[in-house]
Swiss-Prot record:
Its EC number is 5.2.1.8. Pfam families: FKBP_C (PF00254), Trigger_C (PF05698), Trigger_N (PF05697). Consists of 3 domains; the N-terminus binds the ribosome, the middle domain has PPIase activity, while the C-terminus has intrinsic chaperone activity on its own. It comes from Alcanivorax borkumensis (strain ATCC 700651 / DSM 11573 / NCIMB 13689 / SK2). Transmembrane segments: none annotated. HAMAP family: Trigger_factor_Tig. Coiled coil: none annotated. GO terms for cellular component: cytoplasm. Belongs to the FKBP-type PPIase family. Tig subfamily. Residues 161-246 form the PPIase FKBP-type domain. This is Trigger factor. It is found in: Cytoplasm.
Length: 437
């Protein structure tokens, strides 16, 4: 089999492959003979259609089918022979395709880039140092009370913390604008759900009252038409509800798995969960910074096919997350929406794979086992969860992948500049974007 390789641009390769005529013609003849046994045509007995007629009617389609198989098989042999690593599916084009003549075809595809790993000592990582204090536990218990608050109608002016049911209509230069009108909307005052000034304007209103409030949209508002614009909202309050917080009693604690109503046990359980959250948050922040450092350190061409695949995966994930099981038009989620993140993901994946290969890193079996047990402890029957994970290759592979990433992070941190920074619990558990903001 004759093979020639041409680099057309960047990662794109053009491979020309020659296949002996006999290999194609024999395969075509064999398929036609098989087809002859089952073809039914008017005027002929089943299985007795002359080969001449079979070739006339079906020869072209059968040859195309054979060509697809032959080109695919020959391509696999060619890339193995030339030690190429295709990224994505190739495009095939037969340049010589006649019975009795050698087949020649061209396969165009991208290859994986050669990733030259840089030193990690320029990567900077800020590692939060924090602990869960008694005050943090008390604050969390108050948050849990807020989450389980109940609202009831009150006959008084609204206050911060109340929930109001309102109708509103926004006007800009006397004209209604898109998204500025709603009826029967519930709003907790002080939640920051609406633009600045909106909720404050409702404080002090009673059920049945109406008034206009003047507000200005923030300069960074998502709508170009409304950024920095002064508008008037006509507000009608339909209902005012006061918030009633539950007592921290036996019934309340039972909802968190403390059946005997022991407050000491309850606080210990809350602290345990907070410490787990703190540990995970610190690990996540350190990992994200290390991964960002790897991405920023390595610049190389990315296979477009891999980026396209990642964009499709991200789009599908978003459709499943927000589609609510409904039919979703993918056109409202253009490629540009995902491209930057997709490129980062592909680049990071290639760098991580290069690190794993260079350092011959395999998933640490003890760490995998510990992670499986940690996950299982969150369920009622841990033993069944452990058994299920180890009998489910896809689930186990996900856990092994997470452990491999952690092992890569550990390797990076051995060389990176790591600065420990003491901070309160609330700051430590905030996502990086919020903490930086």
């Amino acid at each position: 089999m004759q093979v020639s390789v041409e680099t057309t641009s960047g990662l794109e390769r053009r491979v020309t492959v020659g296949v002996p005529a006999e290999k194609v013609d024999v395969a075509v003849e064999g398929k036609l003979q098989e087809a002859q046994k089952t073809i039914r045509l008017d005027g002929f007995r089943p299985g007795k259609v002359p080969m001449r007629e079979v070739k006339r009617r079906f020869g072209g389609a059968v040859r195309n089918e054979v060509l697809a198989d032959v080109m695919r098989e020959a391509f696999i042999e060619a890339v193995e022979q030339e030690k190429l690593q295709p990224a994505g599916m190739p495009g095939f084009e037969a340049t010589t395709n006649e019975a009795g003549k050698d087949l020649e075809f061209v396969a165009t595809f991208e290859v994986y880039p050669q990733v030259e790993l840089a030193a990690f000592d320029s990567i900077e990582v800020e590692k939060p140092q924090s602990e869960v204090t008694d005050a943090d536990v008390d604050t969390m218990i108050e948050t849990l009370r807020q989450q389980r608050a109940e609202f009831a109608d009150v006959d008084r002016a609204s206050e911060i913390g109340d929930r109001v049911n309102i109708d509103f209509k926004g006007l800009k230069d006397g004209e209604a604008f898109e998204g500025g009108t709603a009826e029967g909307q519930n709003l907790e005052l002080g939640s920051g759900q609406m633009i600045p000034g909106f909720e404050d304007g409702i404080v002090g209103m009673k059920a049945g009252e109406e008034k206009d409030i003047d507000v200005t949209f923030p300069e960074d508002y998502q709508s170009e038409d409304l950024k920095g614009q002064a508008v008037v909202f006509h507000i009608k309050v339909n209902k005012v509800e006061g918030k009633a917080l539950p007592e921290v009693d036996a019934e309340f604690m039972k909802g968190f798995g403390v059946d005997d109503g022991d407050e000491t046990k309850f606080k210990a359980e809350v602290r345990k969960n907070m410490e787990r959250e703190l540990k995970n948050a610190i690990t996540s922040k350190v990992k994200e910074q290390a991964m960002d450092g790897l991405v920023n350190l390595h610049e190389f061409d990315l296979p477009g096919a891999l980026v396209t695949q990642e964009i499709q995966r991200m789009r599908q994930q978003m459709m499943q997350q927000f589609g609510g099981g409904q039919q979703f038009d993918p056109s409202i989620l253009p490629d540009d929406l995902f491209k930057e993140q997709a490129e980062r993901s592909v680049r990071l994946g290639l760098v991580v794979r290069a690190i794993l290969d260079k350092n011959e890193i395999k998933a640490d079996a003890d760490k995998v086992k510990a992670r499986v047990e940690e996950i299982s402890e969150q369920y009622e029957k841990p033993e069944e969860v452990v058994s299920w994970v180890y009998s489910n290759p896809q689930q186990l592979q996900q856990i092994e992948g997470a452990i491999l990433e952690e092992q890569v992070v550990d390797l990076v941190l051995e060389s990176a500049k790591v600065e420990e920074k003491t901070m309160p619990y609330q700051d430590a558990v905030k996502p990086r974007e919020q903490a930086d903001g």
